[in-house]
Structure formats: C-alpha cells, structure tokens
Amino acid sequence: MRILVTGGLGAVGAPLTRELRRRGHEVWVADRVHAEGPNYLRCDVGMYRQVERLFEDRTFDLVYHLAAEFGRWNGEDFYETLWQSNAIGTKNILRMQEKYGFRMVFTSSSEVYGDYEGEMVEDVMDRVPIRQLNDYAITKWVNEMQIMNSAERFGTETVRVRLFNTYGPGEYYSEYRSVICRFIYHALHDLPYTVYLDHHRSSTY
C-alpha cells in the first residue's frame, strides 16, 4: 500500500512511519522541517499550494494526517500558527481527499473532552456533551466537524482517532510539551512537580 504520513517527522509520526515501512508499505513523509530521506516531501499543510503539490505526481491509497501544532498552552500563545496549521491544514488535506479519493486516518486529541471533573468511566464520553476549553481542543473538534461534513457531502472515508497523552523516544522537552514529557524532565533534573487542584487524582498515563 502507498501511504502518506503528514507530520511524519514528529514524535508520533516518526515511529508510525518506521512501523509502516517495517510492514512492507511504501511510505512517503510530509513535514515542514528541512530534512532529507527516502520519499521525503517538505510541506506546510497550512499552505494550500504546498499541499496540492504533494498529489500532483503521485497517488496514495491512505493518508495518516498527523501534521498539527500541539498542546493547549502552545495554542494559546501561538494561536495564529495553531489555526493555520490545524484547521486550515486539515481543510487543505480534505480538499485533496475529495479530489483523489484516498482513505484517511486523522489524529484528534483527548483534549476535545475538556476538563471532566468527575470519575472518568467508559460511558462518560457518550453521556457528557463535549465542552472545549482552549484553542487547541477547539481546532481538533473543528477538524472532526470538517471531516464529518466532507464525508456527508462527498463520501470521503476517514477514521478519527482521539489520542491520549502520547509520549516516547524523540520527543524533546519544552514547557509546551505533554505532562509526561515534563514530568520525566523534572525527574531527571531533580525539579519539583506542579500538580493542579490536589494530589488525589489519577490519569491513564
């Protein structure tokens, strides 16, 4: 299968790309950083013409759309980049999907559920309305709405995956990264942890 991974050099995209290649797929990577490698395509998904060029001379059976700005605080501080990359970027990919008919896997986020204060059990997501509390979450929810709209209007096929607290090799530390990345960094550097509300809480890390 010929597969395109947008954001394929990121903390999630890079290991996904390696695994897909290990399974024998022909994998192309699109990312906005300067890099070299097999089947690498430099592209900022927020720029329509750059996205259009990805599909001019090649076809794909499946696209994993991971390219996005990450994190709630990053989104609050750099909201213009967030909306351009996340919302406009996904719309650009959807335009290509409507034209070329490839299937897609879109990585959304658990952030779309908001800050639920009760005990999180399996059916909460079915019973409690989604309530966005930050720009990052809103862009992910907007993307899901765009995807469902495209499916209704054009018959596109996309699986939406809401990832929870991803972490792993290759994730660099910054104040905008995930809580797991920050906790590990603080542990390695003997720094205190900041826990909000109280310490009588648990999460599926």
Regions found by a protein language model. Name each.
Residues 3-23:
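N-terminal Rossmann NAD(P)H-binding glycine-rich loop of SDR-like oxidoreductase domains
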Residues 118, 145-204:
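NAD(P)-dependent short-chain dehydrogenase/reductase
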Residues 36-47:
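Rossmann-fold cofactor-recognition segment
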Residues 45-85:
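NAD(P)H-binding glycine-rich loop region in Rossmannoid oxidoreductase-like domains
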Residues 69-73, 110-117, 164-167:
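Active-site segment of SDR-like NAD(P)-dependent oxidoreductases
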Residues 59, 91-133:
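Conserved Rossmann-fold NAD(P)-dependent oxidoreductase catalytic core, especially the SDR/UDP-sugar
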Residues 135, 139-142:
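Active-site helix of classical SDR
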Residues 76-91, 95, 138:
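Catalytic Tyr-X3-Lys loop
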